[in-house]
């Protein structure tokens, strides 16, 4: 666990540079599950990397499924974190072999929820009760109209917006998660949202609450709007990739 802890501490130092806070949270949660697993199954507080065998991750998988009663999606995320730390340790020469190199598991095929045109219009025109709800709706709709994820919106600066010679506005940047470049044309609906947040600060959305808070609020907003789908912030990216791109002829 000392190696896992060092890896997690390194991740924390890279938040906002090339890693997101959510990634750090995921590795932190994995480490806590590993600590509980070692205590419950091995009666130890740590284990040397050289002692790891494929049976370790197989037992960890079963532990997460039975003892922790986690969903398959969550289990796969935690297994991925453990596999990655061991792989990096092997590549860095910290351990002589990778005991998990041949380990395979079945990942779930997620159902990608997205809003249709009617649901987007309902959300746009809903009379929401509080300023906080209206702000979170704007954040979500901006993601719907641009495909930009939560982590990248959190660091979105006004200087990333540029107008071309035809008068069209574009936003460019590098994704926090992958460091890949993105270029997105700003549709009129997205520009309309931006106009409400010109407050003289460097960042477009300087009020960004924690993602868990946003998702909880979106759940309540969906109920108020009569939208029966499970609304999370990530649904915004899927909505852009489906409904918005089709509506605007974006490939």
Task: Enumerate the predicted regions with their spans.
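A Lys/Arg-rich helix-loop hairpin that forms a DNA/phosphate-binding surface
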Residues: 1-2, 22-25, 38-62, 206, ...
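Short, polar N-cap/turn motifs at the start of nucleic acid-interacting alpha helices
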Residues: 160-166, 228-229, 249-251
């Amino acid at each position: 666990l000392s190696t896992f802890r060092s890896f997690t501490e390194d991740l924390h130092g890279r938040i906002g540079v090339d890693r997101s806070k959510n990634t750090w949270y995921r590795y932190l949660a994995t480490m806590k599950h590993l600590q509980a697993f070692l205590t419950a199954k091995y009666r130890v507080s740590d284990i040397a990397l050289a002692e790891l065998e494929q049976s370790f991750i197989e037992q960890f998988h079963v532990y997460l499924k039975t003892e922790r009663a986690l969903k398959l999606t969550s289990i796969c995320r935690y297994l991925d974190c453990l596999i990655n730390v061991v792989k990096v340790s092997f590549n860095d020469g910290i351990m002589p072999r990778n005991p998990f190199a041949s380990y395979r598991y079945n990942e779930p095929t997620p159902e990608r929820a997205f809003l249709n045109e009617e649901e987007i219009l309902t959300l746009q025109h809903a009379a929401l009760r509080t300023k906080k709800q209206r702000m979170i709706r704007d954040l979500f709709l901006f993601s719907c109209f641009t495909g930009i994820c939560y982590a990248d919106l959190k660091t979105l600066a006004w200087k990333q917006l540029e107008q071309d010679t035809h008068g069209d506005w574009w936003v460019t940047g590098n994704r926090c998660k992958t460091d890949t470049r993105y270029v997105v044309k700003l549709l009129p609906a997205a520009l309309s949202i931006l106009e409400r947040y010109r407050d003289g600060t460097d960042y477009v959305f300087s009020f960004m609450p924690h993602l868990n808070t946003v998702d909880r609020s979106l759940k309540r907003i969906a109920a108020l709007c009569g939208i029966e789908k499970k609304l999370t912030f990530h649904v915004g990216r899927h909505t852009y990739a489906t409904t918005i791109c089709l509506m605007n002829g974006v490939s």
